[in-house]
Swiss-Prot record:
Binds 2 heme b groups non-covalently. PANTHER family: CYTOCHROME B (PTHR19271:SF16). It is a multi-pass membrane protein. It is found in: Mitochondrion inner membrane. This is Cytochrome b. Component of the ubiquinol-cytochrome c reductase complex (complex III or cytochrome b-c1 complex) that is part of the mitochondrial respiratory chain. The b-c1 complex mediates electron transfer from ubiquinol to cytochrome c. Contributes to the generation of a proton gradient across the mitochondrial membrane that is then used for ATP synthesis. The chain crosses the membrane at residues 33-53, 77-98, 113-133. Its main location: mitochondrion. Heme b b566 binds at H97. It comes from Nycticeius humeralis (Evening bat). Heme 1 (or BL or b562) is low-potential and absorbs at about 562 nm, and heme 2 (or BH or b566) is high-potential and absorbs at about 566 nm. It holds the Pfam family Cytochrome_B. The keyword Disulfide bond does not apply. GO terms for cellular component: mitochondrial inner membrane. The lineage of its organism: Eukaryota, Metazoa, Chordata, Craniata, Vertebrata.
Length: 176
């Protein structure tokens, strides 16, 4: 009798992708980080969407909305901590994925490596926006410190920082 995972149309797709995947026998666990990145990204998107349903960006009520999420929303505290720790796990997996690429010499494939560098910069820019956009003192500090690095650019650095800040300093809510 044949196994259902090899005969059922939907189970067959999953079986061929995960269980009976044709992969070399010498592949190591270092090659799992791309899949782990996908799982972490999916977790971030889902928890971020559910958190955004209850978050308020107004400066007067932002902290209260986070308190509301943690206390009043069913498993809101789990969503918040999964989102926060999922971001850390995402970057751990990302750096290990890049480290594996360096170790195995993937940088020799120039087009692939350059695309990875572009993706790394895009991920870092997205993470910066996710860190700075929600209102709070910590995001003001993050915006000030990280964007102040631009002031090191000769000639245009100070003007660039002032343009990004919209003035002489970071002020008010950044999500409105």
């Amino acid at each position: 009798m044949t196994n259902i995972r090899k005969t059922h149309p939907l189970a067959k797709i999953i079986n061929n992708s995960l269980i009976d995947l044709p992969a070399p026998s010498n592949i190591s666990s270092w090659w799992n980080f791309g899949s782990l990145l996908g799982i972490c990204l999916g977790l971030q998107i889902l928890t971020g969407l559910f958190l955004a349903m209850h978050y308020t960006a107004d400066t007067a009520t932002a902290f209260n909305s986070v308190t509301h999420i943690c206390r009043d929303v069913n498993y809101g505290w789990v969503l918040r901590y999964l989102h926060a720790n999922g971001a850390s796990m995402f970057f751990i997996c990302l750096y290990l994925h890049v480290g594996r690429g360096i170790y195995y010499g993937s940088y020799l494939y120039k087009e692939t490596w350059n695309m990875g560098v572009v993706l790394l910069f895009a991920v870092m820019a997205t993470a910066f926006m996710g860190y700075v956009l929600p209102w709070g003192q910590m995001s003001f500090w993050g915006a000030t410190v990280i964007t102040n690095l631009l002031s090191a650019i000769p000639y245009i650095g100070n003007d660039l920082v002032e343009w990004i800040w919209g003035g002489f300093s970071v002020d008010k809510a950044t999500l409105t």
